[in-house]
Amino acid sequence: MAKQKALQAIRGMNDCLPSETNIWQMVETVLRRVASNYGFAEIRMPIVESTALFKRGIGEVTDIVEKEMYTFDDLNGDSLTLRPEGTASCVRAGNQHGLLYNQEQRLWYMGPMFRHERPQKGRYRQFHQFGLEAFGIATPDIDAEIILLTSRLWRELGINEFVTLELNSLGSNEERANYREALIAYLLEHEELLDEDSKRRMHTNPLRVLDSKNPQVQEALTNAPKLSDHFGEETQTHFDTLCARLDAAGINYVLNERLVRGLDYYNRTVFEWVTTTLGAQGTICAGGRYDGLVEQLGGKATPAFGFALGIERLVLMLTELEKVTNIRPQVDAYVVILGDDAQVAANKLAEQWRDQVPEIRLQCHCGGGNMKKQLKRADKSGAQIALILGDDEITQEKVMVKYLRGQKEQESIEFTQVSSLLSELI
């Protein structure tokens, strides 16, 4: 019989191995804690949604909907899509369960998203996002508070010196429509300098031309009209107030009038946190205001503001900056078991110690072997100590402690002292 070919993960959809999950768990813990610090509650949405949700929510002429969604028909013939982002799903859930109308809600979520992109460093077809959304607040104080929240994330992760905040306002729908006409007129005058993608976008989503990565296109935009020239008093006051709040809080930012975001639902404030440590894929967090999306998806008109960040990019950044330190090993203490009496007693003792110190990561050796083999396993596990149980130790109600990290001498302690020792390891 021919040998079966080993199956592989789908391109762009990666396994997260035990050597990496400790970093992920550390990042996720910080994200959850900071969201909770600001009064946000977790919401969990399905991975699969109706395709119509994303077409209506994200916009039919966006790259995500046109090129990147994983869409299929189920057995009933319904068109379903693996979620490419979380905001539309969060709004759908809020509308469906009556969470949004005439209420203030602060929600966060975390989980896998899917886009059929060309896999590259920091960009994958299955990727994980942390998202945070605030509903029911139209004033710029929530814009400022959420940006402050993101700034706190970077400080807690130790990367605040390596990120830059870029800020812009897209104005209201009416202001943007007026600007769109002026921009199209300008682009038509300079059409010969545009690449094919920008020529297509000029007629479908002209603001996205501002976001082009083509240097020739950017040069052509040098004298393009500015969106800010079309702002009314209300929009300008909103943005000025936000900037004043950030200034007062000591948050540095760069005004970037070509920052437009890739999703159609944004209005007024948009922002990105960018870094040079990831090369071309430099955005690690982005968001803004989307006051029309709730109504667009069938709810009552509700102001909203939120952001999402890519966890893979964040983990990659932390790793490249060597900020991944003091991560607790998978095992704190390893129980070495030698002799028949020790085999009988070890599990009961280990259960007692786990009861006494619930946070301890205590692993008992399984599979037999002499002391040398077991100590080798203990060292490989990352444990700080080995608790050696032999028949003599069981009789004397003692355990031999071997310190696997550092120079401390081996010692014998009473069973009753073990819980205190384990507590020191946490």
From Swiss-Prot:
Keyword Nucleotide-binding included in the entry's annotation: yes
Species: Colwellia psychrerythraea (strain 34H / ATCC BAA-681)
Top-tier EC class: ligase
GO CC, alphabetical: cytoplasm
Entry's family note: Belongs to the class-II aminoacyl-tRNA synthetase family.
Reactions catalysed according to its record: tRNA(His) + L-histidine + ATP = L-histidyl-tRNA(His) + AMP + diphosphate + H(+)
The protein's assembly and partners: Homodimer.
Coiled coil location: none
Record EC number: 6.1.1.21
Name of this chain's protein: Histidine--tRNA ligase
Subcellular location: Cytoplasm
GO BP annotations, alphabetical order: histidyl-tRNA aminoacylation
PROSITE patterns: AA_TRNA_LIGASE_II
Alphabetic keyword roster: Aminoacyl-tRNA synthetase, ATP-binding, Cytoplasm, Ligase, Nucleotide-binding, Protein biosynthesis
Gene Ontology MF, one: ATP binding
Database matches in InterPro entries: aa-tRNA-synth_II (IPR006195), aa-tRNA-synth_II/BPL/LPL (IPR045864), Anticodon-bd (IPR004154), Anticodon-bd_dom_sf (IPR036621), His-tRNA-ligase (IPR015807), HisRS-like_core (IPR041715), HisRS/HisZ (IPR004516), HisRS_anticodon (IPR033656)
